[in-house]
C-alpha cells in the first residue's frame, strides 16, 4: 500500500527513475555520469524553494493578498486581484508556490460572497488562476523550474530572456483581463461579505528579513554575478541555523526528478541511433515538438529531455512555456488547482476539467498564432 501511495503521489519521479535505470542497461554507469548532473540548476532550485517555503510559512504571501483585497470594491476588482496575485506572483515565487498559496486563499475569500455569485465565480476564477500562474511564470528565469534550467543552459542575459518572453506575457495578461471582464459582467457590481479573519499566527520579522536577503543572493547567482555555490551554502547554513523546520517543506521529489532525468538524457545522448533520430525530429520544429511533448510528459521533463538534442534553447523556452497549456498534466502545477477543486468541490470536478481544457486550448492556439506571427 505504501508503494502504491508513493507511485500515485510521485508519478513523475517514479517514471523518471524507471527511465534512468532502464537507460543504464544500454550505457553502464561510469565516470561520465558525473558530467550529466547540472549542479547549478539543482543548487539554485533548492535555494529558491527553501526561501519560498520559509516566506510561505511566515504568511508573507497571504498577508500581501489580504492587503490587496482590502482595496477591492467590485466583483471585477476582486477577480482581477485573485488572478493577478497568481500571474504576477508566479514571476517571483514560481507557479507552484503561487497556486499552493492563492488557490486555497481564493476558496476562503469567495466563501464570503452570495451563494449564486460564489458558484458562478469559483470554477472560472480557479481556472484563470491556474493559467495565470503558468503564463505569468514564463516571463522570468525563476518563474518555473524549466525556465531556471534552460536559462542556465542558454547563456542568455536576464534582459534577453525577458525580451524573449515579454510579448507572450503581455498577450496572456490581456486575454486574462478580457476573460475576467466577461465572467464578471453578469455578476453584482459590488462585493458581498467581508474578508476572512487573519489566521492567528505571528510572523518572525527576522526570518522574513533573512529570507529577503537570501532571495537577493539567489538572484545574483541566477544572473551569474555570484557563484551558485555561494548562494547554496548561504541558504543552507542560514536556514539550518535560523529556520530549520522549513527544510521539511522543500520539494525534494522535484530535485530527484531532475537528477533522474539528467541521467536518462545523458545516457540517451550516448546512444547514436536515438540521438540522431531525436535531433532530426527537432530540427526546425523545436517549439512545436516542445509543445506536443509537454502535453504528454509535462513541460519540465520535456525541457530536460529535448535540451540534450538541440542548441535552439530559446525555442525550447518558448515551446515548454506555451506547452504548459493544454492537458491537465502539461504543467504539473495545474494539478495543484485540480486537487483543490477535488477536495473543496468534488461534485464540480467534471465542470472544472471541461472549462480548464477548453480555456487552455484557446489560450494555446492564440499564443501559438502569436509565435507564428512574430517569428520567435
Each predicted region: which residue ranges?
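Juxtamembrane and boundary regions of transmembrane helices in multi-pass small-molecule transporters
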Residues: 159-203, 335-376
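Membrane-interfacial loop-to-helix junctions in multi-pass transporters
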Residues: 39-41, 70-83, 113-125, 205-209, ...
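Membrane-interface alpha-helices at helix entry/exit sites of multi-pass transporters
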Residues: 76-81, 114-128, 156-166, 312-324, ...
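Long, contiguous bundles of hydrophobic transmembrane helices that form the permeation core
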Residues: 2, 174-235
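Hydrophobic transmembrane alpha-helices that form the pore/transport pathway of multi-pass ion
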Residues: 88-138, 149, 304-318, 346-351, ...
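Interfacial loop-to-helix junctions that mark the boundaries of transmembrane helices
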Residues: 2-9, 30-41, 156-168, 200-205, ...
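Transmembrane helical segments that form the transport core of multi-pass membrane transport proteins
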Residues: 36, 58, 62-65, 213-311
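Structural signal for alpha-helical transmembrane segments and their membrane-water exit/capping regions
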Residues: 2-32, 42-59, 183-185, 217-245, ...
Amino acid at each position: 500500500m505504501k508503494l502504491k501511495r508513493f507511485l500515485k503521489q510521485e508519478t513523475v519521479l517514479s517514471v523518471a527513475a524507471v527511465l534512468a535505470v532502464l537507460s543504464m542497461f544500454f550505457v553502464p554507469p561510469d565516470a561520465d555520469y558525473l558530467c550529466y548532473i547540472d549542479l547549478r540548476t539543482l543548487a539554485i532550485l533548492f535555494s529558491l524553494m527553501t526561501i519560498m517555503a520559509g516566506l510561505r510559512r511566515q504568511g508573507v504571501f497571504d498577508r500581501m493578498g489580504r492587503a490587496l483585497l482590502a482595496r477591492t470594491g467590485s466583483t471585477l476588482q476582486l477577480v482581477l486581484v485573485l488572478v493577478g496575485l497568481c500571474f504576477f506572483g508566479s514571476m517571483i515565487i514560481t507557479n507552484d508556490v503561487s497556486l499552493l498559496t492563492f488557490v486555497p486563499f481564493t476558496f476562503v475569500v469567495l466563501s464570503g460572497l452570495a451563494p449564486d455569485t460564489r458558484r458562478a465565480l469559483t470554477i472560472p476564477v480557479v481556472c484563470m488562476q491556474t493559467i495565470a500562474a503558468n503564463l505569468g511564470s514564463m516571463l522570468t528565469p525563476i518563474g518555473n523550474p524549466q525556465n531556471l534550467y534552460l536559462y542556465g543552459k542558454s547563456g542568455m542575459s536576464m534582459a534577453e530572456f525577458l525580451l524573449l518572453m515579454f510579448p507572450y506575457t503581455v498577450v496572456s495578461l490581456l486575454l486574462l483581463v478580457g476573460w475576467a471582464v466577461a465572467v464578471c459582467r453578469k455578476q453584482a457590481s459590488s462585493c458581498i461579505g467581508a474578508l476572512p479573519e487573519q489566521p492567528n499566527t505571528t510572523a518572525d520579522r527576522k526570518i522574513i528579513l533573512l529570507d529577503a536577503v537570501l532571495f537577493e543572493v539567489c538572484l545574483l547567482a541566477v544572473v551569474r554575478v555570484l557563484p551558485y555555490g555561494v548562494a547554496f551554502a548561504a541558504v543552507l547554513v542560514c536556514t539550518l541555523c535560523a529556520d530549520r523546520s522549513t527544510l521539511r517543506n522543500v520539494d525534494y521529489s522535484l530535485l530527484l526528478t531532475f537528477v533522474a532525468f539528467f541521467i536518462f538524457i545523458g545516457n540517451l545522448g550516448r546512444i547514436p541511433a536515438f540521438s540522431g533520430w531525436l535531433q532530426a525530429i527537432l530540427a526546425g520544429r523545436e517549439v512545436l515538438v516542445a509543445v506536443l511533448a509537454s502535453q504528454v510528459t509535462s513541460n519540465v521533463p520535456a525541457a530536460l529531455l529535448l535540451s540534450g538534442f538541440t542548441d535552439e534553447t530559446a525555442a525550447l523556452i518558448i515551446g515548454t512555456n506555451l506547452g504548459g497549456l493544454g492537458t491537465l498534466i502539461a504543467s504539473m502545477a495545474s494539478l495543484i488547482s485540480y486537487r483543490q477543486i477535488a477536495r473543496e468541490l468534488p461534485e464540480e470536478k467534471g465542470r472544472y476539467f471541461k472549462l480548464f481544457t477548453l480555456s487552455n486550448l484557446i489560450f494555446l492556439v492564440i499564443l501559438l498564432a502569436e509565435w507564428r506571427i512574430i517569428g520567435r
